[in-house]
Amino acid sequence: MYPAHLLVLSAVCVSLLGAANIPPYPLNLINFMEMIRYTIPCDKTWGHYADYGCYCGAGGSGTPVDALDRCCYVHDNCYGVAENKHKCNPKTQSCSYKLTKRTIICYGAAGTCGRIVCDCDRTAALCFGDSEYIGAHKNIDTKRHCQ
């Protein structure tokens, strides 16, 4: 191997080692976005669901406006159980899963944080795929509609 190749290989390895110290915060969000993209219609992106209804996005209050918003309500509650009952941190918890044959398979032992969070995300993503997206419910006035 040429010295230049060794130099490049070394630089790549050092870069990868440095990347291993990146906090896992975005990892679960990336996993969840990937699950959503797998289950929703092609003309939508996960961003369509980020500020939808009363519960899709940050926070949530009131009564869900439709079936899709109920998916987010259930997901929020699932994360709440993961945090309060199981002492998991859903936003930073990595998980193992497989996208196959129009479904999502979560791996890991039942009751572990990775599996609990994966099951929350899987259920929500499949629910998104089964629910109608109503454009009028995107960016609604939550002070008016979500009391």
From Swiss-Prot:
UniProt key word Disulfide bond: yes
Subunit structure: Heterodimer; disulfide-linked. The A chains have phospholipase A2 activity and the B chains show homology with the basic protease inhibitors.
Keywords tagged on the record: Calcium, Disulfide bond, Hydrolase, Lipid degradation, Lipid metabolism, Metal-binding, Neurotoxin, Presynaptic neurotoxin, Secreted, Signal, Toxin
Propeptide residue intervals: 20-27
Protein name: Basic phospholipase A2 beta-bungarotoxin A2 chain
Catalysis performed (reactions): a 1,2-diacyl-sn-glycero-3-phosphocholine + H2O = a 1-acyl-sn-glycero-3-phosphocholine + a fatty acid + H(+)
Any Gene Ontology biological process: phospholipid metabolic process
Signal peptide (residue range): 1-19
EC number(s) on file: 3.1.1.4
Cofactor: Ca(2+)
Record-linked Pfam families: Phospholip_A2_1
InterPro entries, A to Z: PLipase_A2, PLipase_A2_Asp_AS, PLipase_A2_dom, PLipase_A2_dom_sf, PLipase_A2_His_AS
Gene3D superfamilies: Phospholipase A2 domain
Enzyme class: hydrolase
